[in-house]
Swiss-Prot record:
Thiol-disulfide oxidoreductase which is required in disulfide reduction during c-type cytochrome synthesis. May accept reducing equivalents from CcdA, leading to breakage of disulfide bonds in apocytochrome c; following this reduction heme can be covalently attached. GO terms for biological process: cytochrome complex assembly. Belongs to the thioredoxin family. ResA subfamily. Signal peptide: none annotated. Disulfide bonds join C89-C92. GO terms for cellular component: plasma membrane. The keyword RNA-binding does not apply. This is Thiol-disulfide oxidoreductase ResA. Pathway: Protein modification; cytochrome c assembly. One of its GO terms (molecular function) is disulfide oxidoreductase activity. The lineage of its organism: Bacteria, Bacillati, Bacillota, Bacilli, Bacillales. The gene is resA. Residues 47-189 form the Thioredoxin domain. Keywords: Cell membrane, Cytochrome c-type biogenesis, Disulfide bond, Membrane, Oxidoreductase, Redox-active center, Signal-anchor, Transmembrane, Transmembrane helix. The chain crosses the membrane at residues 22-41.
Length: 192
């Protein structure tokens, strides 16, 4: 009987291990399915040309600008160039002088340039603003919330937004002066 009882005990242990392992596997599969379904929700939308640009509000760094925050919805009725950049990004540095050169002219035409800094600290951004004599709004996305909202990958990335809030164009990489001017013309409010 000892042999029979030993066999029965081994079978019970095997069955218990099988049930335990199956339960763990089922829990893991359920967790993976939940994670996939959660990531498919609308808050993970990738914005494309023709979509409405999502609203945001960020603290303003540039002292040249009157307001202390920049909120996209406050610029309704104007064309908006929304540029995502960082001080360590060489292509970003290359296009900043073009943006500054065109800012005053296009501000009069109803186009606002907003350069969202993705740097970690305000100090480096403030020094950059002084070095390049930037006079357009430079809000700071310290925590990356707006970067995540717009799904920004490579820098610079620029959204050109029509006066009605619709995305006209998305450009990844540095802009030349000619391309920049062309896009700014495309989003300028129509003069009647």
């Amino acid at each position: 009987m000892d042999i029979q009882q030993n066999k029965t005990n081994k079978q019970k242990k095997k069955r218990n291990r099988f049930i335990f392992r199956s339960s763990i596997l089922l829990i893991l599969v359920a967790a993976v399915v939940f994670a996939i379904v959660s990531n498919m929700k609308d808050d993970n939308k990738i914005y494309r040309v023709g979509d409405a640009a999502p609203d945001f509000q960020l603290k303003q760094i540039s002292e040249e600008v009157d307001q202390s925050t920049v909120q996209l919805s406050d610029l309704e009725g104007k064309g908006v160039m929304l540029n995502f950049w960082a001080t360590w990004c060489d292509p970003c540095k290359a296009e900043m002088p073009y943006m500054q050169d065109l800012y005053a002219e296009y501000k009069e035409k109803g186009v606002e340039i907003v350069a969202v800094s993705l740097d970690g600290t305000e100090l480096v951004v403030d020094q950059f603003i002084d070095e390049y004599d930037l006079t357009f709004p430079v809000p700071h996305d310290k925590n990356g919330e707006v970067k995540d909202l717009y799904k920004i990958g490579p820098m610079p990335t620029t959204y050109f937004i029509k006066p009605n809030g619709e995305i006209e164009e998305i450009v990844q990489g540095a802009l030349t002066l000619d391309r920049l001017e062309g896009y700014l013309n495309d989003i300028a409010p129509q003069q009647n």
